[in-house]
Regions:
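Extended substrate/RNA-proximal surfaces in nucleic-acid metabolism proteins
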Residues: 1-58
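Active-site beta-loop-alpha junctions enriched in small/polar residues
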Residues: 9-11, 36-39, 62-68, 94-97
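Charged helix-capping and loop-helix junction motifs
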Residues: 18-21, 44-50, 72-82, 106-107
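Structural motif
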Residues: 27, 84-85
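A short helix-to-beta-strand connector/capping loop
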Residues: 55, 85-86, 116-119
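Short active-site-adjacent structural elements
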Residues: 67-71, 97-102, 132
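Short acidic/histidine-rich active-site segments
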Residues: 86-102
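Mid-to-C-terminal alpha-helical segments outside catalytic/metal-binding sites
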Residues: 104, 108-137
């Protein structure tokens, strides 16, 4: 697939992040920026998320952030992005079945209730299927 999951350091500056996205787009890849809520240069900067998506990047947030498991700030920011339909994927950030178990159900149920069934289906089912099939979102 031409989709690439990008992870940056939490303290990387915006220009570095934007240039990384630009470089991948220039080579014909579709960058998916992992857990945007963790990057200090993006936190509470919805306009920067809009800039990146306008360039062609896709946005992924963690289910735990949406549900407030990692603090109010990340919860608030991810929900702002969801409200504006700037999120393309929700993931677990699971590394194992104990410490960070893969739990999506509560988050999926919340998104269906708050933002609608179609948007939830897109970010949990349709968009991931497009990635696997190497199809344009």
């Amino acid at each position: 697939s031409r989709y690439v999951l990008l992870e940056f350091g939490p303290m990387d500056d915006y220009d570095y992040l934007r240039n990384g996205v630009y470089d991948l787009l220039s080579e014909g890849y579709f960058p998916i920026i992992a857990h945007v809520e963790r990057y200090q240069c993006l936190a509470d900067h919805v306009e920067r998320i809009k800039d990146l998506t306008g360039m062609g990047a896709y946005i992924q947030v963690n289910a735990g952030s949406v549900m407030g498991n990692v603090g109010f700030g990340m919860k608030s920011f991810t929900r702002k992005l969801l409200k504006q339909e700037l999120v393309h994927f929700v993931a677990t950030d699971a590394h194992d079945t104990k410490k960070r178990a893969p739990e999506l159900k509560k988050c999926a149920d919340y998104i269906v209730h708050k933002y609608g069934n179609q948007y939830a289906e897109d970010i949990f089912v349709n968009n991931p299927e497009h990635v696997i099939r190497n199809e344009i979102l």
